[in-house]
Regions:
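Domain-level recognition of nuclease-like catalytic cores that cleave nucleotide substrates
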Residues: 2, 6, 54-55, 103-130
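Acidic-basic catalytic patches of nuclease active cores, encompassing PD-(D/E)XK
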Residues: 2-53
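Short, well-structured alpha-helical interface segments that form or flank functional binding sites
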Residues: 32, 57, 81-84
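Structural signal for conserved beta-strand scaffold positions within catalytic alpha/beta enzyme cores
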Residues: 50, 71, 100, 119-121
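Catalytic centers of nucleases
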Residues: 53-65
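Short, charged, amphipathic alpha-helix that recurs within catalytic cores of restriction-modification
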Residues: 75, 80-112
Length: 130
Protein backbone atom coordinates (compact mmCIF):
# COMPACT_ATOMS: atom_id res chain seq x y z
CA UNK A 1 0.00 0.00 0.00
CA UNK A 2 1.52 3.35 -0.95
CA UNK A 3 1.74 6.36 1.38
CA UNK A 4 -1.09 8.27 -0.31
CA UNK A 5 -3.45 5.28 -0.03
CA UNK A 6 -2.40 4.70 3.57
CA UNK A 7 -3.00 8.39 4.38
CA UNK A 8 -6.47 8.22 2.79
CA UNK A 9 -7.28 5.07 4.78
CA UNK A 10 -6.01 6.70 7.97
CA UNK A 11 -8.11 9.82 7.31
CA UNK A 12 -11.19 7.71 6.66
CA UNK A 13 -10.60 5.76 9.89
CA UNK A 14 -10.21 9.01 11.88
CA UNK A 15 -13.44 10.42 10.46
CA UNK A 16 -15.35 7.19 11.12
CA UNK A 17 -14.05 7.16 14.70
CA UNK A 18 -15.24 10.76 15.21
CA UNK A 19 -18.69 9.88 13.83
CA UNK A 20 -19.11 6.73 15.89
CA UNK A 21 -19.00 8.66 19.17
CA UNK A 22 -22.11 10.69 18.26
CA UNK A 23 -25.16 10.03 20.43
CA UNK A 24 -27.97 11.84 18.62
CA UNK A 25 -31.17 12.58 20.52
CA UNK A 26 -34.28 11.11 18.93
CA UNK A 27 -36.38 13.41 16.75
CA UNK A 28 -33.61 15.63 15.46
CA UNK A 29 -34.11 17.55 12.24
CA UNK A 30 -31.71 16.82 9.39
CA UNK A 31 -29.85 20.10 9.87
CA UNK A 32 -29.57 19.34 13.61
CA UNK A 33 -27.84 16.11 12.57
CA UNK A 34 -25.56 18.15 10.27
CA UNK A 35 -24.62 20.28 13.30
CA UNK A 36 -23.95 17.21 15.47
CA UNK A 37 -21.72 15.67 12.81
CA UNK A 38 -19.86 18.94 12.25
CA UNK A 39 -19.35 19.37 16.01
CA UNK A 40 -18.00 15.84 16.35
CA UNK A 41 -15.59 16.40 13.47
CA UNK A 42 -14.51 19.76 14.94
CA UNK A 43 -13.87 18.14 18.32
CA UNK A 44 -11.63 15.62 16.55
CA UNK A 45 -9.94 18.54 14.75
CA UNK A 46 -11.12 17.30 11.34
CA UNK A 47 -12.00 20.20 9.03
CA UNK A 48 -14.98 19.96 6.71
CA UNK A 49 -16.86 22.13 4.26
CA UNK A 50 -20.67 22.20 4.39
CA UNK A 51 -23.03 21.82 1.41
CA UNK A 52 -20.30 21.47 -1.22
CA UNK A 53 -21.35 21.48 -4.89
CA UNK A 54 -19.73 18.60 -6.78
CA UNK A 55 -21.55 19.03 -10.10
CA UNK A 56 -24.72 20.73 -11.32
CA UNK A 57 -27.61 19.64 -9.06
CA UNK A 58 -25.18 17.53 -7.03
CA UNK A 59 -24.24 18.87 -3.57
CA UNK A 60 -22.81 16.76 -0.75
CA UNK A 61 -23.58 17.60 2.88
CA UNK A 62 -19.95 17.63 4.07
CA UNK A 63 -16.59 17.30 2.37
CA UNK A 64 -13.48 16.51 4.41
CA UNK A 65 -9.83 16.65 3.35
CA UNK A 66 -8.74 13.91 1.00
CA UNK A 67 -12.08 13.92 -0.81
CA UNK A 68 -14.01 12.10 1.91
CA UNK A 69 -17.67 13.01 1.44
CA UNK A 70 -20.32 12.66 4.12
CA UNK A 71 -24.04 12.45 3.31
CA UNK A 72 -26.48 12.73 6.22
CA UNK A 73 -30.03 11.36 6.15
CA UNK A 74 -32.71 11.61 8.81
CA UNK A 75 -35.17 8.79 9.41
CA UNK A 76 -35.26 5.74 7.15
CA UNK A 77 -33.91 6.76 3.75
CA UNK A 78 -35.25 5.09 0.63
CA UNK A 79 -32.52 2.62 -0.37
CA UNK A 80 -32.94 3.06 -4.13
CA UNK A 81 -32.81 6.86 -3.92
CA UNK A 82 -29.81 6.95 -1.58
CA UNK A 83 -27.83 4.49 -3.74
CA UNK A 84 -28.59 6.65 -6.80
CA UNK A 85 -27.44 9.74 -4.89
CA UNK A 86 -24.24 8.06 -3.67
CA UNK A 87 -23.59 6.86 -7.23
CA UNK A 88 -23.77 10.47 -8.50
CA UNK A 89 -21.35 11.58 -5.78
CA UNK A 90 -18.94 8.67 -6.39
CA UNK A 91 -18.78 9.62 -10.08
CA UNK A 92 -17.29 13.01 -9.13
CA UNK A 93 -13.52 13.40 -9.25
CA UNK A 94 -13.40 15.30 -5.94
CA UNK A 95 -14.67 12.24 -4.04
CA UNK A 96 -12.28 9.50 -2.87
CA UNK A 97 -14.72 7.77 -0.50
CA UNK A 98 -18.18 8.31 0.96
CA UNK A 99 -19.71 7.99 4.40
CA UNK A 100 -23.48 7.76 4.81
CA UNK A 101 -24.73 8.87 8.24
CA UNK A 102 -28.32 7.80 8.94
CA UNK A 103 -30.66 7.50 11.89
CA UNK A 104 -31.78 4.07 10.75
CA UNK A 105 -30.02 1.21 9.04
CA UNK A 106 -29.99 1.15 5.25
CA UNK A 107 -28.05 -1.35 3.15
CA UNK A 108 -25.70 0.28 0.65
CA UNK A 109 -22.93 -1.26 -1.48
CA UNK A 110 -19.40 -1.39 -0.01
CA UNK A 111 -18.06 0.28 -3.17
CA UNK A 112 -19.52 2.43 -5.92
CA UNK A 113 -17.37 3.35 -8.96
CA UNK A 114 -14.50 1.67 -7.09
CA UNK A 115 -14.78 4.10 -4.17
CA UNK A 116 -15.31 2.80 -0.63
CA UNK A 117 -18.69 3.46 0.98
CA UNK A 118 -19.10 3.37 4.76
CA UNK A 119 -22.34 3.66 6.71
CA UNK A 120 -22.74 4.98 10.26
CA UNK A 121 -26.17 4.30 11.75
CA UNK A 122 -26.81 6.60 14.71
CA UNK A 123 -29.48 4.35 16.28
CA UNK A 124 -27.01 1.46 16.33
CA UNK A 125 -24.61 3.66 18.27
CA UNK A 126 -27.20 3.67 21.05
CA UNK A 127 -27.50 -0.10 20.81
CA UNK A 128 -30.83 0.16 18.98
CA UNK A 129 -31.08 -1.51 15.57
CA UNK A 130 -34.09 -0.15 13.71
Amino acid sequence: MDTQTNTAADSLAEILHALRVIRAPIQQGEYDLHDLVRASLAEAEIPCAHEVPLAPRCRIDLLCPGGIGIEIKRGQPDRKRIVMQLTRYAACGQISSLILVTERTVAVPNRIHGKPISCVCLNRLWGIAL
